[in-house]
Design a protein with these regions (language model features):
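Active-site beta->alpha N-cap acidic-glycine motif
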Residues: 1-72
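Conserved, mostly hydrophobic/aromatic
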Residues: 8, 43, 52, 79, ...
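The substrate-binding groove and active-site-proximal loops of carbohydrate-active enzymes
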Residues: 23-30, 53-55, 82-94, 118-122, ...
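Generic structural signal for well-ordered alpha-helices
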Residues: 36-40, 63-67, 95-102, 131, ...
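C-terminal domain-boundary segment and adjacent tail
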Residues: 45-46, 199-282
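Metal-dependent polysaccharide deacetylase catalytic core of the NodB/CE4 family, i.e.
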Residues: 46-127, 139, 144-151, 172, ...
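Active-site-adjacent pocket scaffolds in enzyme catalytic domains
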Residues: 111-112, 118-216
């Protein structure tokens, strides 16, 4: 069973942990290339192609990174333009942000960009209109709906496997692929990326993804900054210190373990030819 390997291409100072204003970004050291280098080395070593969701901001500042990803045969998706949560934007602001990222990525790659992931999984019940906007912009795939809730994001009763969302009574021509979770009865446990991947032991991650793979393809995700152990260590509240910095040194090893143990490919390759249900989210 093949799984999707995804990377959200943002720098350490873009994260919602810090929530720095855009006007301050130029004050911080660009380090996105360090994590990308490590990720590409792993993918090359195991001959795996992945899907990179790239911020428009990063693409404009580091066009050479986008070109390198394309030259190596990886798939490019949009992560929005300025790492704004959908929940902080109205419909027109969101459309403008996504369109800007799509334009720069298509210019750099020479390819149609038809895959999207929101920042911090911020397509939630009150921002379902964002899926209609993505369809208007000719996106065909999305990975923004998290099938569990956190203070910032999530959809309590969302499907845990790929589906076509029904919004306002209409099935969208947009395939949604949620991040993988391990079912626990009616509940579920995230394990496949971010802090969850850094906190959980390899044995549990292996067990959880094998359980998903009994019936479905899974999806894992990471960020370049999660492999960058030399990034600046800011004085932040304890909960932010934990969510952002905890166990960064384990990320590369766990990703390599997954690449050794499971099969991976790009988003579009994994979902190609599948039959997926249409589901109305409530």
């Amino acid at each position: 069973m093949k799984n999707v390997f995804t990377i959200d291409v943002e720098d350490w100072f873009h994260t919602m942990d810090f929530n720095f204003p855009v006007s301050s970004w130029s004050n911080y050291e660009d380090r996105v290339h360090h994590g990308i280098k490590d990720i590409l080395e792993l993918l090359d070593k195991y001959n795996v192609k992945a899907t990179f969701f790239v911020l428009g901001y990063v693409a404009r500042k580091h066009p050479e990174l986008v070109r390198e990803l394309i030259n190596k045969g990886h798939e490019i998706g949009s992560h929005g333009d300025m790492h704004k949560m959908v929940t902080t934007q109205n419909r027109e602001e969101f459309k403008k942000d996504v369109a800007a990222s799509k334009e720069i990525l298509e210019d750099l790659t020479g390819k149609k960009i038809n895959i999207y992931r929101s920042s911090s999984w911020s397509i939630v019940p009150k921002t379902m209109w964002a899926l209609e906007v993505l369809e208007e912009l000719s996106f065909e795939y999305d990975s923004s709906i998290q099938p569990f809730t956190t203070p910032l994001s999530g959809f309590k009763n969302a499907p845990r496997t790929p589906f076509y969302p029904v919004v306002n009574g209409r099935r969208l021509n947009l395939l949604e692929f949620p991040p993988s979770v391990m079912p626990l009865g009616k509940a579920c446990l995230p394990f496949c990326g971010g802090l969850y991947l850094r906190v959980l032991p390899k044995s549990f991650i292996n067990y959880a993804l094998n359980k998903v793979n009994k019936n479905n393809s899974g999806m894992i995700y990471t960020h370049p900054w999660e492999l960058d152990v030399k990034q600046p260590r800011l004085k932040v509240p304890p909960h932010i210190k934990f969510t952002h910095y905890y166990n960064l040194s384990s990320t590369k090893d766990k990703l390599e373990y997954l690449l050794q143990t499971f099969e991976f490919d790009t988003f579009s390759k994994v979902v190609e030819g599948g039959a997926y249900p249409s589901i109305e989210l409530k």
